[in-house]
């Protein structure tokens, strides 16, 4: 039976950057990795209502720089920047170093797989029909400019006794093309019938790094000469 590789993992270093960018000695590596995990857990829990897509962590010169990518920067910053100061102090406490927090706004949340998956999960918790939630997400992404999108939900859909999976796709989603810019993410919806998993793939185009795509024109077949009678 065929298995699927993680769309983001296979593209790391090709079209996808790492979300933790730092180097460390062997003795410090495990501590840094653990503190990265703790920082992400804290910020994800604290900023549930802020539509956070990803958290990028850098460690320049015995300090830590955290960039929060969010569709609602006002919720993260708070009144006169008070909330950011609270976050910065807590991150510094977790890591034991000086911390800096940057906010990056996501201009098109309809094209961010994590935000789309979270949105569908929240709609399912509000008892919106899963087909309607999937179709709405797909239509919004295609309207904004996605070249393709696929959405899959799995679990006791509509309160059914037997769990199943359903998916909806529009456009093209070339998972085997490494230069394809595919954003992939998952989310969970905790309903009264159990947990429903949500997966989203969004194809935004191909990353060619200045190369011009070559389109081969079909070769014309030579005309056959009529047989001599």
Swiss-Prot record:
Disulfide bonds: none annotated. One of its GO terms (molecular function) is structural constituent of ribosome. Belongs to the universal ribosomal protein uS3 family. One of its GO terms (biological process) is translation. This is Small ribosomal subunit protein uS3. InterPro entries: KH_dom, KH_dom-like_a/b, KH_dom_type_2, KH_sf_prok-type, Ribosomal_S3_C_sf, Ribosomal_uS3_bac-typ, Ribosomal_uS3_C, Ribosomal_uS3_CS. Keywords: Ribonucleoprotein, Ribosomal protein, RNA-binding, rRNA-binding. The keyword RNA-binding applies. One of its GO terms (cellular component) is cytosolic small ribosomal subunit. Gene3D superfamilies: 3.30.300.20, Ribosomal protein S3, C-terminal domain. Binds the lower part of the 30S subunit head. Binds mRNA in the 70S ribosome, positioning it for translation. Pfam families: KH_2, Ribosomal_S3_C. Part of the 30S ribosomal subunit. Forms a tight complex with proteins S10 and S14.
């Amino acid at each position: 039976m065929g298995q699927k590789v993680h769309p983001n993992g296979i593209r790391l270093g090709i079209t996808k950057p790492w979300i933790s960018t730092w180097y460390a000695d062997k003795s410090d590596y495990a501590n840094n990795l653990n503190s990265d995990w703790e920082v992400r857990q804290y910020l994800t829990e604290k900023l549930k209502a802020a539509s956070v897509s990803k958290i990028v962590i850098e460690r320049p010169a015995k300090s830590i720089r955290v960039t929060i990518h969010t569709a609602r920067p006002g919720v993260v910053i708070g009144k006169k920047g008070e909330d950011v100061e609270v976050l910065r102090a807590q991150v510094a406490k977790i890591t034991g170093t000086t911390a800096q927090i940057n906010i990056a706004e996501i201009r098109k949340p309809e094209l961010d797989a994590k935000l789309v998956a979270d949105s569908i999960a929240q709609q399912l918790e509000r008892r919106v029909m899963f087909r309607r939630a999937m179709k709405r997400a797909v239509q919004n992404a295609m309207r904004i400019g996605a070249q393709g999108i696929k959405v899959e939900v799995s679990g006791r859909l509509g309160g059914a006794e037997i769990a199943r999976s359903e998916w909806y796709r529009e456009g093209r989603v070339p998972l085997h093309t490494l230069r394809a810019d595919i954003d992939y993410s998952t989310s969970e919806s905790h309903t009264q019938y159990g947990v429903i998993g949500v997966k989203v793939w969004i194809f935004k185009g191909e990353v060619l790094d200045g190369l011009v795509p070559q389109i081969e024109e079909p070769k014309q077949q030579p005309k056959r000469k009529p047989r001599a009678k």
